[in-house]
A protein has these predicted regions:
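Metal-dependent phosphoester/phosphodiester hydrolase catalytic core
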Residues: 1-402
């Protein structure tokens, strides 16, 4: 059931429920409208990689308990099409099969909502969502029914055309503090047969034009740009993550970074998902002749990126059979090869929290266990980017915002 409601006041909490023809009522839901210009603060939860089979959704439970978050941004892999036997922590019955049509995807969405923490999070605050490769079948006609089911089961702005339901990139404006620009780097890629070709595009020409026009027209203090995949360059021990990220589209990244740098478009924070690890990175301008990047001063960075750890999907430790020795070696290698990284965590799961004011954004990284139900969480790190700086402050502060 989806209902579009007009005439709501900005920056206001509303409660809602649904009643069917037989008088049966749904659980009570709570939402919050976006603020009007002049709001002094916005807080966003950021998540991705929520596999019901790989662990418990304790992170969702902790988000649901918060009353200080304006919206949740889910950057894809909201659900998973298959059960990974190497991560089989729990499999609610009945045993699922891989969806291959719209009915199968509808069933998978219903299956996920058997989880009480997910239901609580969905009922406690508004969600801004985009799909990724496990939410649909990108190579099948009509995306295997995945796009249709995703739209039916989630609150997404209606498509610009009934003939293009796959178009879900959009802007959500939070007063005059930030423009949330949700991109889709999955379904509009323009591939090339030549690796590294300048003709390849991760956004596609139409979406790139939309994104750059939104950035140019924005008069908000910040732009928070959602990307399902990692934006930052990755070298060394984590380079294998780059196969489906912006690393595979270097010309696209250079084009966008050049647009930001040459146009004087400061104060952009990219949020990303998919890779399951936690990563905070400066974004060096890769173009020849650009200001050389300095990890000490942040010079040469055109913005910053935050990728919180997955809600539950397997991390580096799961992929190396829990070997802490290997995890430590990969961690050291990643940090040594990537001076732009301000924070790395390869094993923990949870969510990110962005605390946005006109002068700075503080990113908090919250972690919860996944192997059993738990009502605990811990603050694993905080980072700060100052207005006009375009790089993460170092050393990072280590106190939660209040």
């Amino acid at each position: 059931v989806q209902v579009r409601v007009d005439g709501l006041a900005p920056g206001t909490i509303y409660y809602y429920r649904f009643t069917n023809a037989d008088g049966e009522r749904s659980e009570l839901g709570r939402t919050r409208t976006t603020p009007e210009p002049g709001a002094e603060r916005v807080r966003l939860a950021v998540v991705s990689g929520s596999s019901i089979y790989s662990g418990y959704f304790n992170a969702y439970g902790r988000i649901a308990e918060r009353t200080d978050v304006d919206a949740l941004v889910h950057l894809g892999d909201y659900l998973y099409d298959f059960v990974d036997d190497e991560e089989r922590v729990r499999v609610p019955m009945p045993e699922p099969v891989v969806p291959d049509d719209v009915a199968g995807w509808r069933g998978r969405h219903a299956y996920y909502l058997t989880d009480p923490n997910l239901r609580a999070a969905r009922a406690s605050l508004p969600w801004v969502m985009i799909w990724d490769n496990h939410d649909l079948e990108q190579r099948e006609a009509d995306f295997g029914g995945g796009v249709q089911a995703f739209r039916e089961w989630n609150a997404i702005t209606p498509p610009v055309s009934v003939d293009a339901p796959e178009i879900a990139y959009r802007r959500v404006r939070f007063g005059s503090l930030l423009d949330l620009l949700i991109t889709d780097v999955l379904l509009f890629r323009e591939e090339s047969l030549v690796p590294g070709s300048d003709e390849a595009s991760i956004l596609g020409a139409t979406q790139y034009a939309w994104l750059t026009s939104q950035i140019s027209a924005s008069d908000s203090a910040w732009r928070v740009i959602g990307s399902q995949k990692i934006v930052a360059p990755i070298e060394g021990s984590l380079a294998l993550l780059g196969g489906s990220t912006w690393d595979a589209f270097e010309a696209s990244r250079a084009q966008l970074f050049g647009f930001l740098a040459d146009g004087g478009h400061d104060d952009n924070l990219f949020i990303s998902g998919d890779a399951h690890i936690t990563l905070a990175s400066d974004l060096p301008d890769p173009r020849p002749g650009a200001t050389p990047y300095s990890a000490t001063t942040g010079a040469g960075s055109i913005g910053v990126e935050l990728m919180p750890g997955s809600v539950s999907r397997g991390n580096v430790d799961e992929s190396v059979n829990g070997s802490q020795t290997l995890v430590n070696a990969i961690d050291r290698g990643a940090r040594a090869a990537n001076p732009q990284f301000a924070f790395v965590d390869l094993v923990r799961h949870g969510y990110g929290l962005l605390d946005v004011t006109a002068e700075r954004i503080v990113a908090e990284l919250w972690y919860s266990p996944i192997l059993e139900p738990s009502d605990t969480e811990e603050l694993g790190g905080t980072l700060e980017v100052q207005r006009g700086a375009n790089h993460w402050q170092r050393p990072a502060p280590m106190e939660p915002t209040e």
